[in-house]
Amino acid sequence: MENLIERAARDLLNSKHAIALTGAGISTESGIPDFRGPSGIWTKNPEAERKAYRSYETFLHDPGKWWEERLTGPNLLGDLTEAAPNAGHHALVELEKAGVLKCVITQNIDGLHEKAGTAKLLEYHGSVLKLRCVHCTLRFRPQEFDLQKLMAEGKLPPRCPYCQGIIKTDTVAFGESIPQDVADMSLEEVWKCDLMLICGTSAVVYPFANLPRMARQSRYEDHWKAEAGLGAARSSPSVKIIEVNGEPTPLTAEGISDYIITGKTGEILPQIVEAVKNFKK
């Protein structure tokens, strides 16, 4: 284990543009259950999963009704806004401050990376801490709208003050496309990176799970084109992909990742930070 942690630290220090991808596993130590694990939200409440799959269809047909259900119905995800970041989130902030991590792309909607202080953050599936205009994609804080008053006055759904588009929660529903701005910026980071640190994700939710595969494939294609005289290679011919997860994933089995450090992200990531500090002395 120690050798892999030191190896990860050296790989990070040798990289020029390292990014991190994070999933539900990094937040379980903050008391937030995952979705499909033994104690996951969908595992324990299959009806909640079925309702989640129908949610976006309801929004498209009747956004006012969708908002009423959000404001009056049970919160199937619990109050994620009360959760606090853990050692894993803070470790990524330390790596960013040390200059070895350039961006975090997360599929989590809990807002914990923002709370921890990550500066360059792309929330692939949105955040419970924000609302989003479905037309112009501007984000807002829920406190900017008096949602209860709008419901009492029969004025749901809320409207964007700039373009009058319909406002929904920023979280991406099943069947809803990833917001184009986030998708584009994520692809740009994947294209630029020479190291990808994948933390706490089983890599089975698409299109997020494609990002590591795209990082690997884009380098092969980029340098094949350069060798063929069809363009200049943008960076090194290989990208280092490191997993930190409680168990092997499809990325491990497919050989997409170079190696995996097995364990809790809240324990492993702080050790990587300490190793980075020791190497920099």
Task: Label each residue range with its predicted role.
Residues 1-281:
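Conserved catalytic core of sirtuin-type NAD+-dependent deacylases
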